[in-house]
Amino acid sequence: MKEIRYKNIDRLLNPSQIAFIGGADAEVAINEAKRRGFKGSIWPVNPKRDYIAGYKCYKSVLDLPKGPDAVFLAIPASQIIRTVNELNHVNAGGIVCYSAGFKEIGQRGISLEKQLVKSLKDMVLVGPNCYGVINYLENSALWPFAHGGFCPGFGAAIITQSGMLSSDITMNQRSLPLTHMISLGNQASLKNTDFINYLIDKKEVRAFGLHIESIENISDFEVAAKKAIEAQKPIVVLKTGKSKIGATLTKSHTGSIAGSQKIYNSFFKKLGIITVDTPSEMIETLKFICISGIPKGKECAAFTCSGGGATMVADIGEMLNLKFSKIPKKNIKAISSFLPNIATISNPCLLYTSPSPRD
């Protein structure tokens, strides 16, 4: 990765100033940045309004005090190129382009997206047609909707091609620790591999969760995936566009070609990538890795609150070739002291949540 590109990704994810260009959508994004806890400068840009979200508006990008580290762009597609040229003039760092109307709409949009990429020069861009980025470690957000998520100082970096999926994951109530949420959209400039390469050395990032509709550059992805494995930071992939209808929707959604699922499965397996089928599976798998670390073998212990649950765990565990080790005799007495008399000490272990019957 070119040094200037790396530097501008860093500016985008760790900004001291954010320019919000647009109207109502920019106002929502400003409020979300404030709610996230962003402590830097907030600069709204709108030629028709005096204030947005309580902040005085600049009439033009050229009126800004300096080149902002990060920019949230929510204006009509027809105005994007001119605005990006102005951002180049003031030496901005990185852009989140929330605006749609590019590759995903067909040939006219493809042409406009090519112009957009050419106009960036050394700046970096997430999108277009994306939600943006959230840095939970540094409390910065360029995000156009209400969001959730928490960070205990470590967690997973989620990188998706779907805006709504990324938003849904931030709202999960499954205690998944997050470091970053990145919604890529059309990936005109920055790809998922750029963010993997940037985040791979961050000690707080323990795993990567990727939602993938397609992979544009196989060799770049392979290199990034191998780096992640070498760094012992597993990649968990949710691949969509598996069905014929899903592949068609993928093309209309972000302009991507889904490709053969069998080829993707073989490719992921070769790279040691974990694949899942649902967002819930992704969340639970990442949570396990971030909290417990990478499993060293197939031996495990399971605890449930019902006999039916214990049976299901045992059945599924056997299907997955997991080994439920016998509890050593020396430990049975200690475990028994924590459980009611009716409990059966086994693995899976049934933890009764109600007390023993009383006289």
Spell out what each predicted region is.
Residues M1-S354, R358:
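Catalytic-core regions of core metabolic enzymes
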